[in-house]
Amino acid sequence: MPVELLNIEGLWVRYNAAEVLRQISFRVAAGDYVGIVGPNGSGKSTLIKAALGLVGGERGNVALFGTPLASFTEWRRIGYLPQRLRFFNPNFPATVEEIVGLGLLAGKQLPRKLTREDRQAVEKTLEFMGITDLRKRIIGELSGGQQQRVLLARSIVGGPELLILDEPTTALDPETRDKFYTLLRDLNRDKGITVILVTHDTSSIGTYASRFIYVDKEIIFNGTFDDFCHSTEMTNLFGEYAQHLICHRH
C-alpha cells in the first residue's frame, strides 16, 4: 500500500471574517501526480499554504508523512516552489548554481558553505534539468522559462519525496509551459517524486496529472481528469461547449 505523504481532514480557513476554504479533505499517496485546479480566488494557494503550515486553519487536521503538521520537522523531504518568488532583477548578484545550491540549505544553520557532496548534487541537478551551460549566468539575465527551470532545480536538488508547486507556469508562453509540465511528469515517473501542482490551467493539467482536484472554496471534484470530463460537475462549471473544448484535447 503506498505511503501517505499528505492527509488533510476537515480543513476550514478564514481570513478575518471571510471564509476562504471549507471542509477540505483529501489524501496524497507516494507516487501521485495531483493537479489542484480552480478559478482565481478559489483558495488554491491558501490550501497549499495551510498544508505547509504557512497559514493557520480555523479547524481541521493536516498530517505530513504520517506526522501531525505541528510536530513535523523533516522539511528536507518536501520541495516547494511558491507562487511569487523573485530573483529576476538583472542586478541580483547570484548565479544559477548558487541559486540551486540554496535548496540544500533548508533547515541548516547559516552561514554555511556547500560541501563537496552538495556541489555534486548541484551538478547532477543542473544536468538533469538541462541547464548545465547556464551555471555561471546571473539568474536575472535568463528568460522566464529558464528561470523557472532554475527555481525548480532549487526545489529538487535536496532529493525531496514530495514536490509542491503553486502556479509555476503563469508567466510562461504555451510552448514553454507544456515543456515545464512534461518535465514535472518526468520527475514523477523517472525519479519517483510525488507532485502536487496548483494551476488555473484546467485543460493542460489533464494531460499530465494522474489525479485532478477542482477547488472553489470547497472540493467540487476529486478523481481522474477523464472522469471529470464526463461528470455533471464539469457541465455545471463550464457548460457543454466549453466542456467539449477542454476535454477534446485529451
Locate each region found by the language model.
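Conserved catalytic motifs of ABC-family nucleotide-binding domains
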Residues: 159
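Catalytic Walker B motif of ABC-type/P-loop ATPase nucleotide-binding domains
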Residues: 163-166
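Conserved ABC ATPase "signature" region
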Residues: 101, 115-134
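Conserved ABC ATPase signature
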Residues: 138-142, 146
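H-loop (His-switch) and adjacent beta-strand-loop-beta switch element
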Residues: 212-224
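Conserved ABC transporter NBD signature motif
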Residues: 60-74
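Helix-to-loop junction immediately C-terminal to a conserved catalytic motif
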Residues: 52
